[in-house]
Amino acid sequence: MKYQKLENQEAHWKWLYLIKKHREGENITRYEERSLSEDKVKQLLSQQNQPQAIENWIKAHLSPHLMIKLDQAIRARRKRFFNGEKQSTKKKSIDLEYAVWLRLSRYSRKMKMTLSETITYMIDERESKAQYEHQISAMKAGLKDLLK
């Protein structure tokens, strides 16, 4: 396993996920009867700061169709949590106008690169062009001095 499991943290994430699903109107329990389902959700709500109780509630009452979704959500959250710790793996975002993004995307596909690689390539090319222009202007100035 690439990422360390933090039991207390993950129990809190599971609690947040399940409460969010409940508030969106989804039945998070395995019970069809509304009153029984509501009782179990109230029980879960009262267990917010009890990681072991949350895990026990999930084992006993979670809807089977939510089990896989919950595991996937926690796995993704764990990855984002650990990747967010290091500057090198933390996701960054930039604002691009749609037309700019479209051009960059087409250019990336043409170059068979990712968007990040394409941006780095374009910056490197621009820097080398500026360095080349500086060398040419220095040579021109040197030639003018020689011809005087």
Swiss-Prot record:
Q: Which UniProt keywords apply?
A: Cell cycle, Cell division, Cytoplasm, DNA-binding
Question: GO terms for CC?
Answer: cytoplasm
Does Secreted show up as a keyword for this record?
Answer: no
List the subcellular locations: Cytoplasm
Role according to the record: Required for spatial organization of the terminus region of the chromosome (Ter macrodomain) during the cell cycle. Prevents early segregation of duplicated Ter macrodomains during cell division. Binds specifically to matS, which is a 13 bp signature motif repeated within the Ter macrodomain.
Family (UniProt): Belongs to the MatP family.
Know the name of this protein?
Macrodomain Ter protein
From the broadest rank down, the organism's phylogenetic lineage runs: Bacteria, Pseudomonadati, Pseudomonadota, Gammaproteobacteria, Pasteurellales
